[in-house]
Amino acid sequence: MDLGLLAICFALFVVATLYASVGHGGASGYLAILSLSAYGAMEAAWLKQHAWCLNLVVAAIAFWHFYRAGHHVPKLTIPFIVASVPLAMFAGSLKVEGSVYDLLLSICLVLAAWRLYTVGTEEGDIRGVPQWNVAVPTGGAIGFASGVVGIGGGVLLSPILLLKRWATPKSAAATAAIFVWVNSLASLSGAALSNQLVLEFETLLPFFFAVIIGGFIGSRFGADVAPQHIIRKLLIIVLIVAAMKRVVGLF
């Protein structure tokens, strides 16, 4: 393994560790790292599809740890994925290029991080799961955006769950993890059904190794060790880092 590939794998490991700690797959970070490496010359479809594959691995590991620790609430998760799956699949079949999407996503991430910061770190009372007429369109919109941009949607869903007090940080992480997994799979399926799949499994193998280790470390810390307020702070960091990486990609 040459030094360049080793550096990429280490960076992917770090991203997977941080994102898995809050139940995310890490696609935003993976896209940024790959774009800043020699793989940046690849088409957007190649980058998105490989990021989705890494998402599948890390989100699965994260969900398992948060589920095992008793943080998953099915009645919170199901309404959000009902519409997100078909819309992510449809969006994944679209061929989307242009920097406008990077800019819009960066704005969304910064706003989400700012809102999380301004509400403070106190937990407050959980209001309970949202009504289906609210959760279904919310999940659908995030699913569509995920398929267009190349993410799993965790960085968009988690802030909403916390700001609306529909979930604790750890239950939000569990829901975000399964949400990311189904959206990533749906988006890849959409690309496959539209004959746009360009996966290189020999390229993915070392990446898988790196993110599996990071995913285990991060999700174990987030599910079993970190206090709730630490999870909130980690999520703010994740959102800011993802936004900064997107902005860098515009230049």
Task: Say what each PLM segment does.
Residues 56-60:
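Central hydrophobic cores of alpha-helical transmembrane segments in multi-pass inner-membrane proteins
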Residues 186-190:
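Alpha-helical transmembrane segments of helical membrane proteins, especially in multi-pass transport
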Residues 153:
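Gly/Ser-rich catalytic serine loop of serine hydrolases
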